[in-house]
Amino acid sequence: MAPGAFSLHQATSSDQEITYIINYGEGQTEPLRTKILNTYTMVFNDGSAPGAVDTSWLGTLGLTGWVGPEARGAVSGAGITGRDPRFAYTVGFSNATAQYWAAADTTDGHFTSAGMIPGTYTMKVYKNELAVDTRTVTVNAGASTSAGTIAVTGDPGAATALWRIGDWDGSPAEFINGGKVTTMHPSDVRMASWTPGDYVVGTSTPATGFPAYQWKDVNGALTVRFNLRQSQIVPLRLRVGITTAFAGGRPKAQVNGWVSANPSPSTQPSSRTLTVGTYRGNNTMYTFDIPATELVVGQNVLTLTAISGSSGIRFLSPGYSYDALDLIPTP
């Protein structure tokens, strides 16, 4: 349960209630899928892991929309190449009426997604929580579709960077407070300071030097200092990845005297996210092309400023969650 959802905590002196919420609406990135019949089982026992529960009797009730096992299909992949061994990979399937997930094997990336309703799906390979490959696949009743071996070509982390802060994986976990944001409110006294001071490339570390979240009214300007050699004074591209944003928050970049244009806001959930325990939204990468004439040999100063046409106070001001940022030669 997300922090702040106190209205969901209900109890009296004589009874306790369990509320199982399937569709909550916080951080919702896709239209609500309706008319989906799924089986959910709540088991009360001594605390040990329950065994398989037979729910096949649901198929005898004549429920509208029920699709039995024999009318479903599967997708299997022989493997996934181009993976980063530091991360787990997941394969997701989605269309307007259904959604499925399958874990990729840690050794070679093979996977199987069974019990799928027939149809055409968008299939995405996720590096942790960042989509790094997208394609379509068709599922047929009573059959298994082969996706072959998938070669990942869309991982931004595969690019050689002059420097990189964080990991391109769709999560802020490696940054300051990144491991706490799903269980604590940003104002919690157990949180480290959201304003850590300048980040110095080559000296600072993401875990202690760069915040997971940035808000317009909390830590509205973050500074990164980095050195360049003469051979590195070429057109460079700054890439800034965010995982979600609130109230149109997005980063604007300044490098030395060069100031970027205001980027457009990303498409994100309309609800609160950063203050209700989720960093998950629509992963978005902002790119800023820096002219070589604006760079200097020695120390350069990058300032990231949280901007938005909206306003708010403190943690309810426009903001966003970081995925990673890096500097690469302009392609």
Which residues are covered by each model-predicted region?
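Beta-strand-rich recognition/accessory modules
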Residues: M1-G68
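Short, ordered, surface-exposed loop/turn motifs in non-cytosolic proteins
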Residues: G73-V75, T81-Q99, P118-G119
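Short, acidic Ser/Thr/Gly-rich low-complexity loop/linker segments typical of extracellular
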Residues: N95-H110
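A short, solvent-exposed beta-strand micro-motif common in secreted/extracellular proteins
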Residues: G109, G119-E129, A306
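Structured interaction patches on ligand/partner-binding surfaces of diverse proteins
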Residues: E129-G148, V152-D155
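Compositionally biased low-complexity segments at domain edges in trafficked proteins
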Residues: T149-T203
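Beta-strand-rich ligand-recognition modules
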Residues: N219, N227-I233, G241-T330
